[in-house]
Structure formats: structure tokens, C-alpha cells
From Swiss-Prot:
Quaternary structure, from the entry: Heterotetramer composed of ParC and ParE.
HAMAP family from the UniProt entry: ParC_type2
Cited PANTHER family: DNA GYRASE/TOPOISOMERASE SUBUNIT A (PTHR43493), DNA TOPOISOMERASE 4 SUBUNIT A (PTHR43493:SF9)
Residues at the active site: 122
E.C. numbers: 5.6.2.2
GO-annotated cellular components: chromosome; cytoplasm; DNA topoisomerase type II (double strand cut, ATP-hydrolyzing) complex; plasma membrane
Catalysed reaction equations from the record: ATP-dependent breakage, passage and rejoining of double-stranded DNA
Protein name in UniProt: DNA topoisomerase 4 subunit A
Keywords per UniProt: Cell membrane, DNA-binding, Isomerase, Membrane, Topoisomerase
Limits of the Topo IIA-type catalytic domain: 34-497
Top class in the EC scheme: isomerase
UniProt keyword Amino-acid biosynthesis, yes or no: no
Gene (UniProt): parC
């Protein structure tokens, strides 16, 4: 219960909140966010147009500073901040947002790229011809006026327009519990549909839709729909799909985009295509160039000829704003309440409003004409007895006495007598009776036509059709958007987007890569220079193939070759990039190709001597997603991985030159989450440095830190069981590299300060110790 004390009210917060919010919600629904069905304007837009009209900013008058208009509108009609008013003015002036702009701006009013308009102190504004037409005859009492926010001015509740502006320019807005999104339509089609509705008040929607083809957006584009047009326009709700319009130049392998979807930013579309090129999501696209100018939009996409332009565009429609959805929702204010309105209902409501305007105008003109006709008839009568009138006026004591005598003696009405005595005698005697008779005839015609318009719906319909035909000529509009019917989205398989070509791919331990022409494999490998990184994979491979990498953190990652960006220059890209495949501290241990599925067993070895085998076919490996293939303890990481064909010997070599050799089949097959088993007993502070898989007849080649090369035959090595006591190698120096080679022809990468060189084992044996000691080596797969 309310308690009143010293003009204070105590109420429960939930009661205050409910009442206050409901009032606020009603206000923003009725007076802020939703357009009026009749003139298609929100309150701020209506106040802007009326404020400019009151300032005399007509299409034929000079521009005035936007800041001045904003101040006038804010001070008299819309006290909600200058930025909201100026933003609305700018939007009302943008030809890519409206079929017909209601405001004209002199200066920078933004761009289709989303650039901001110049500040209001720099731009100038006035009403456009279309905007002025919305206000036509507003001073003839066609619409009602209400007090402004401080009761110091009057403002119209609606503009007296005979143009169906709601559907011509569309509208969008969000209120409490309501939202609206009305599509722009073609002016000529709407006016023709109104004429049809006048001629055939009971016509069906399908007849209207033969005229109104669908939305017509200022930026054009191809328009599709999922439900039928009749369902969408019957309910006033539905979804349109807008696609960019493009042309194909097959000779130049170019796609030229000439129209973009409504409410999208050209710069964002270009950026999205550039990101697709940068991320190598579609290798068929070579470049995108924005060549747009004042003559229109022109985005040029250069592409390779292996993929048709239609499939490229199908991909871009899916992954960029070259295709967007427009969710139609015709929510408007009608009779102070929000309703969702279909096309037929809108035409009927609007025609009813037009009839009200015509009747109000006819009443206004009838009143003026009747009053003037009364005066003219009195003047004509006075001229016919001018001598008596003059004599009577001269005998009168004053003006009121003369007026009374005219009424009493000659039966003039009060208004007629007032008009006569208000004239000077020379005006009365010199008045041309012919001109008065002519004006009488015109006024009588006006009275008759006004009375006819008030009384006859048929007469009003005739006038409306004439007005609509005039608007069709004055605001003639060619259709910009093409209505293409039901959407039939072309499905493009990923395999179709991949260029069937062989490339060279080079991958380093640190996660850098280079994709190049296949004939440049040797050059790219030998040109590689790095003091801290090492090549571990250099191979020609089909673009349609896939590689997988095993990392030091125990992850296995599948990478489609086409996802690797091509670079004609000898420049490395990184897998630790904007969208990282590897973590910054993660390195690559092994690289294989997915065509090795016939060798699905992967053998893994960690720094702390843990070994395991894993079946690749049982892993759910997804492209570009890390899949765990071994669990690692703290401070442990993978040092080796290789694919097992048959049972081989595996040699684990430690930092302290201990080794153990056993058969790979002794290593158990373990699930991806398993840590594996001990492969070698390590002494304190020792760790695995090299892992070599080899056949029984293959020698081990060891490169020592002093540059010496040692070949150990299998007979010199002790083959034991896994976890047997490690043996000491007959080598005193630290081992820099270790590999197997039975033929002395194994290619290894000789990497020095001045670049890289591919050499065989036999060539290695002929090098000096000094040269060998200053280089790094690695076997290439």
C-alpha cells in the first residue's frame, strides 16, 4: 500500500519497476524505434524533415550548415542529443541505404565502405525533392499537430504524403519486445499496385505480386527466397537471400562483382576475400582488387583456370558477405499500436490514409474558396450599385456604421460588408468586374470539386490515380534487384576446389614451411639458410594429398597440402601464425604423407626413454586439429617418430653415448592416451638424443663433434631385448648426428653458414673433419 509522507511515496520496487518500465517500453515502441504505417517514418526522421521545412531548407534554396539544422531540430523537436540526429540525417542522405533520399548533403556523407561522414560543422544540408514531397501541403491542415516536448512548438503526428514511403525506402529498428525490418521496394511497382487496388478493391495477393516482383534494394543484387513470395507478403514476415551480382571474363580469368548485398560494407567484403587468399582457403583465387569509383562498384577477382567462376562464387557466397539473409519483419505503428502487416493490408491502410488526406485538403480548400466566393459575390453586387454604395459610405459616421448600413440597406453579409468598407473608394471604383467574374467562376469550380471530393470516393480514387501517375514520372525508378525465385544453393565439394597439381613442400623442425613449384625442390632445399632451424621434410607432393606432422608435445596434426600457402619466392611461412597450428614452443619431430596409410603403425620415442607404437587408423585425426598420440610426463617431450613397415631394429642413442638395440615388434601397441613403456634404462641426467630404425644388414653412420665419421656394422652392435642394460658406444666424442645407410647413397642435408647442400654418405666420407664439425646434418624424408 502507498504511504504518503511529506509529498514522498513509498512503493515496492517491483511495483515501481513494472509500471515505469511498461511506460518506457510503450514510449520507445510508439515514439522512437518503429515507423508509422502512413508516412513510413520514425519520430526522429519526421522531426528532421519538418524542422528543415520550417527552416526553409527547400530543394531550391541554398544549403545550410548541418550543425545549424541539428541545433534547430534538437532545440525545438528532438531533445535526445546531437549525434543521434546527425546520424539519422546522414543515413537519410545515403543513396546506398535508401531508394530515394529524403535529405540532401553537400559534403562527405560517408561511403558504401563504411567510412564515417564528416563532422556536422563541415557538411551542409537541405531537403531533397523526394523529402520535400513528403511535406507537401502540410500547412493546409491535412494532419493533426501536437505540442513538442516543452509545449513551445507544434509538430505533426504524421506527414501528409501520398507516396508509399514505408515500402519505398523500408525501415529497421528495435524496440522493447518488437523489431522491424522492412525491405525497400520499387517505386513504380508500388504505385502501379496502388492503382490496381483502387480499380479492383477485392483483387488477390497473387495479382498484386504480378506487379510487385519483390524487394528492390538500393544496392541491387540477386534476390532469392525459401518460402513462396505469397506466403512472405501475406504474413509480412519471411527471409530473402541476397547475392552479389557478378560478371565473368573467361578470357582474363576474372570475376567482376558489380552489385553487393544491401546493408553490407564493400571494404569488409574485400577484406574477407583477402583473408581467404591469405589463409589459402581457396587456392583458385589469386588476388582481389577494388576498382570501384563514382560510376559504381567494381571488385575484380583474378583466379586460376582450373576452377570455374561459378564454383568460386559458390564458395564465396558461403564464406563472405557476398551472400546475406534479409529477414523481413513488417512491424509498424498503426493507430498507436504495433502490428505486423502484409502487403495487401498495407495497401489498404495506405489508401485509407490517402483518402483522409484528400478529404482534409478538400475541406480546407472548400472553406477558403467559400469564404473568398462570398467576398467576390459581395464585390460584384457592390460594383453594380457603386453610386449608392459610395453615397452610403460618405454619409456614415464611421466604418462600423457604414458596415451596418450596408447590411441593413443592401442585404450584404457581415463578411461582404467588412470587405467593402475595408477597401478604399478608388479601389472599389476601379475594380475590374471581368476579373471578379473570372475569379468567381474559378472559385465555384473549386467549391464544386472540393464538395465532390468530400462526398465521392470515386472522385477521390480518380484524383489518386492521377497523382500516382504523376509520381511515376517524377520518381521513375528502374528495378535494381533481380528477383531470381527459390534459392538453389550450389553445393561445392571440397575436392572440387583443390587444384590437381604437384608442388614441392619443405618443412623445418621449428614449424616453418615453403610451398613452391615442384621443379624448384633442389633449389629451395639448398637455398635454405638458418643457424637455429633444420629441414626435416623436403618432397614433391600432390596438392590433393595430405601430410601429417608429429610434434614434440605428442600431438599429431593432419594438414591438407592445399591449405599450405604457395609462395613463388624463397620465403618461409610459419605454422605458428595468425591461426596457429603449432604452439610457439612446439617443434616438429616427424612429417609423413597420408598415402602411407598402408603403413599405419607409428613408432614414438620420448626424451626420457619412453617408447610406444600406435595404430594411426584408430586415431580420429581431423584436418588442422591436434590429436594426442602419446601422454608425456613433465619435462618430457618426443624426440623421434617414424612409420614402421615390417619388424626392424631400433637403436636408441643417448647424450652420454649409451645405446640399446632391439626389435620394434617388442614395443607394444598402445592407445593414444598411453604413455608407452621404457625403451632404455637411462643413467642420471642422461636422455635420448637419436633414434634410428634400420635393417639387420645396414650400418649405422655417426657424425661426431670433431668432424669424424664412424660407420658401425650391425655385427659391432649388441642386439638385446627392450629394457636391457644399455651399452657404451665405441665413440669418445659427442655425436652430432646418427643415421643408417647400407648403400652409401643416402641423401643427407649438409647445412652450413652459407646455405644447404644435399650430399651422399660417400661424399661425406671425403670431407674434412673441420668442414664436418662446422655443419649440421639431417636425413630428409
Amino acid at each position: 500500500m502507498d504511504q504518503k509522507n511529506n509529498n514522498l511515496f513509498q512503493k515496492a520496487i517491483e511495483e515501481v519497476f513494472a509500471v515505469s518500465f511498461s511506460k518506457y517500453a510503450k514510449y520507445i515502441i510508439q515514439d522512437r524505434a518503429l515507423p508509422d504505417l502512413r508516412d513510413g517514418l520514425k519520430p526522429v526522421q519526421r522531426r528532421i524533415l519538418y524542422g528543415m521545412f520550417q527552416m526553409g531548407l527547400k530543394p531550391t534554396t541554398p544549403y545550410k550548415k548541418s550543425a545549424r539544422a541539428v541545433g534547430e531540430i534538437m532545440g525545438k523537436y528532438h531533445p535526445h542529443g546531437d549525434s543521434s540526429i546527425y546520424d539519422a540525417i546522414i543515413r537519410m542522405s545515403q543513396s546506398w541505404k535508401n531508394n530515394w533520399t529524403t535529405v540532401s548533403i553537400h559534403g562527405n556523407n560517408g561511403s558504401v565502405d563504411g567510412d564515417n561522414a564528416a563532422a556536422m560543422r563541415y557538411t551542409e544540408t537541405r531537403l531533397s525533392l523526394y523529402g520535400f514531397e513528403l511535406l507537401k501541403d502540410i500547412d493546409k491542415k491535412l494532419v493533426s499537430f501536437i505540442n513538442n516536448f516543452d509545449d513551445s512548438e507544434k509538430e505533426p503526428t504524421v506527414l501528409p504524403t501520398l507516396l508509399p514511403n514505408l515500402f519505398i525506402n523500408g525501415a529497421s529498428g528495435i524496440a522493447a519486445g518488437y523489431a522491424t525490418n522492412i525491405a525497400p521496394h520499387n517505386t513504380n511497382e508500388l504505385l502501379d499496385s496502388l492503382c490496381l487496388r483502387i480499380d479492383q478493391p477485392n483483387c488477390e495477393l497473387k495479382q498484386i505480386l504480378k506487379i510487385v516482383k519483390g524487394p528492390d534494394f538500393p544496392t541491387g543484387g540477386n534476390v532469392y527466397f525459401e518460402k513462396s513470395l505469397s506466403d512472405i507478403y501475406q504474413a509480412g514476415k519471411g527471409k530473402f537471400i541476397i547475392q552479389a551480382k557478378y560478371e565473368v571474363n573467361k578470357n582474363l580469368n576474372q570475376i567482376e562483382i558489380t552489385q553487393i548485398p544491401y546493408e553490407t560494407l564493400k571494404a569488409n567484403i574485400v577484406k574477407q576475400i583477402e583473408e581467404i587468399i591469405f589463409d589459402n582457403k581457396l587456392s583458385a583465387i589469386e588476388s582481389v582488387i577494388d576498382s570501384s569509383d563514382r560510376n559504381g562498384i567494381r571488385i575484380i577477382i583474378k583466379h586460376k583456370d582450373f576452377l570455374p567462376a561459378e564454383k568460386i562464387m559458390a564458395f564465396l557466397f558461403k564464406h563472405t558477405q557476398l551472400q546475406v539473409n534479409f529477414n523481413l519483419n513488417n512491424t509498424v505503428i498503426a493507430n498507436r499500436f504495433p502490428i505486423q502487416i502484409g502487403l495487401l493490408s498495407y495497401l489498404d491502410h495506405f489508401l485509407k490514409f490517402c483518402h483522409e488526406l484528400i478529404i482534409n485538403k478538400a475541406k480546407y480548400e472548400l472553406e477558403l474558396a467559400s469564404k473568398r466566393l462570398e467576398i467576390i459575390l459581395g464585390l460584384i453586387k457592390a460594383i453594380s450599385i457603386i453610386d449608392k454604395i459610395i453615397k452610403l459610405i460618405r454619409s456614415a459616421v464611421d466604418k462600423s456604421d457604414a458596415r451596418e448600413k450596408l447590411i441593413d440597406n443592401f442585404k450584404f453579409t457581415f463578411n461582404q460588408a467588412e470587405a467593402i468598407v475595408s477597401l478604399r473608394l478608388y479601389q472599389l471604383t476601379n475594380t475590374d468586374i471581368f476579373e471578379l467574374n473570372q475569379e468567381q467562376n474559378e472559385l465555384e469550380k473549386t467549391v464544386i470539386s472540393s464538395e465532390q471530393l468530400i462526398a465521392s470516393e470515386k472522385a477521390r480514387n480518380k484524383l489518386l490515380k492521377k497523382q500516382f501517375e504523376g509520381y511515376k514520372k517524377q520518381f521513375h525508378q528502374q528495378r535494381r534487384s533481380q528477383i531470381c525465385g527459390f534459392i538453389n544453393q550450389k553445393k561445392v565439394e571440397e575436392s572440387e576446389l583443390i587444384e590437381n597439381k604437384t608442388y614441392g613442400v619443405l618443412i623445418t623442425k621449428a614449424g616453418n614451411y615453403h610451398k613452391f613449384e615442384s621443379n624448384q625442390l633442389l633449389k629451395s632445399t639448398t637455398d635454405f639458410k638458418s643457424e637455429s632451424d633444420t629441414i626435416i621434410f623436403a618432397q614433391t607432393i600432390a596438392n590433393t594429398d595430405q601430410i601429417f606432422i608429429v610434434t614434440s608435445l605428442g600431438n599429431i596434426i593432419n594438414i591438407p597440402v592445399y591449405k599450405l600457402a604457395f609462395n613463388s619466392k624463397n620465403k618461409l611461412a610459419s605454422l605458428v601464425s595468425k591461426k596457429p597450428i603449432l604452439l610457439e614452443y612446439e617443434t616438429i619431430v616427424f612429417v609423413g604423407t597420408m598415402n602411407s596409410v598402408n603403413q599405419p603403425i607409428l613408432v614414438l620415442t620420448s626424451k626420457l626413454g619412453m617408447v610406444k607404437r600406435i595404430d594411426l587408423t584408430k586415431l580420429n585425426i581431423k584436418p588442422l586439429k591436434a590429436t594426442l598420440c602419446i601422454s608425456l610426463r613433465d619435462k618430457d617431450h618426443l624426440v623421434s617418430a617414424f612409420l614402421q613397415q615390417d619388424d626392424k631394429l631400433i637403436c636408441l642413442v643417448s647424450d652420454h653415448n649409451y645405446y640399446t638395440v632391439f626389435h620394434t615388434n617388442e614395443i607394444p601397441l598402445i592407445s593414444s592416451k598411453g604413455m608407452g613403456v621404457k625403451g632404455m634404462k637411462l643413467k642420471l641426467e642422461d636422455q635420448i638424443k637419436f633414434v634410428v630404425a634400420f635393417e639387420a644388414n645396414e650400418p649405422l653412420v655417426m657424425i661426431c663433434s670433431d668432424g669424424s665419421v664412424i660407420n658401425l656394422k650391425q655385427t659391432e652392435l649388441v642386439v638385446v631385448s627392450r629394457m636391457a642394460t644399455a651399452k657404451k658406444l665405441p665413440v669418445k666424442k659427442a655425436i652430432n648426428y646418427c643415421f643408417s645407410d647400407a648403400t652409401n647413397t643416402q641423401l643427407i642435408n649438409f647445412q652450413g653458414k652459407n646455405g644447404s647442400k644435399l650430399i651422399t654418405t660417400s661424399e661425406l666420407n671425403q670431407m674434412s673433419k673441420t668442414a664436418i664439425s662446422q655443419t649440421r646434418f639431417n636425413k630428409l624424408n
